[in-house]
UniProtKB/Swiss-Prot annotation:
GO terms for cellular component: cytosolic large ribosomal subunit. InterPro entries: Ribosomal_uL13 (IPR005822), Ribosomal_uL13_bac-type (IPR005823), Ribosomal_uL13_CS (IPR023563), Ribosomal_uL13_sf (IPR036899). The keyword Transferase does not apply. This protein is one of the early assembly proteins of the 50S ribosomal subunit, although it is not seen to bind rRNA by itself. It is important during the early stages of 50S assembly. This is Large ribosomal subunit protein uL13. One of its GO terms (biological process) is negative regulation of translation. It comes from Solidesulfovibrio magneticus (strain ATCC 700980 / DSM 13731 / RS-1) (Desulfovibrio magneticus). Keywords: Ribonucleoprotein, Ribosomal protein. CDD domains: Ribosomal_L13. Pfam families: Ribosomal_L13. Belongs to the universal ribosomal protein uL13 family.
């Protein structure tokens, strides 16, 4: 019996919508990363993008445990001397709740060209509405 290697024509992409309200951030990101990567499918191959497309709604209502709202920091650097900026999770959820989930999922995907392609299939919205009704997404309970 030969080892099965999927071809691009063998890959079927389904659309799923995930409601992030009252979900723990890390557990939600882990489930979304598995679906984006395609590890839940039989035809998974680590060198190919076999994953599904995921729509996350209500990103502003995501929860964390403990005191992470004040203790967790997001860092970025401008490239200039003394240009290190830090933002707390509470501020990020107030200003850009989509980026909180995107950064959490990004850390769970491969750090290469394939991981960047997988991240493009993730659509995140702070509210309930999303413009992807034409794709007829199925609801995914995580």
């Amino acid at each position: 019996m030969k080892t099965f290697s999927p071809k691009p024509t063998d890959i079927t992409r389904n659309w799923f919508v995930v409601d992030a309200s009252d979900k723990i951030l890390g557990r939600l990101a882990s489930a979304v990363a598995v679906r984006l990567r395609g590890k839940h499918k039989v035809e998974f191959a680590p060198h190919m993008d076999t994953g599904d497309c995921i729509i996350v709604v209500n990103a502003a209502k995501v929860l964390t445990t403990g005191r992470k709202l004040d203790q967790k920091k997001y860092y970025r650097h401008s490239g200039w001397i003394g240009g290190l900026k830090e933002t707390s999770l509470r501020d990020m959820l107030a200003k850009k709740p989509e980026d909180v989930i995107r950064k959490a999922v990004r850390g769970m995907l491969p750090k290469n060209r394939l991981g960047r392609a997988m991240l493009k299939k993730l659509k995140i919205y702070a509210g309930e509405a999303h413009p992807h009704e034409a794709q007829k997404p199925e609801t995914l309970d995580v």
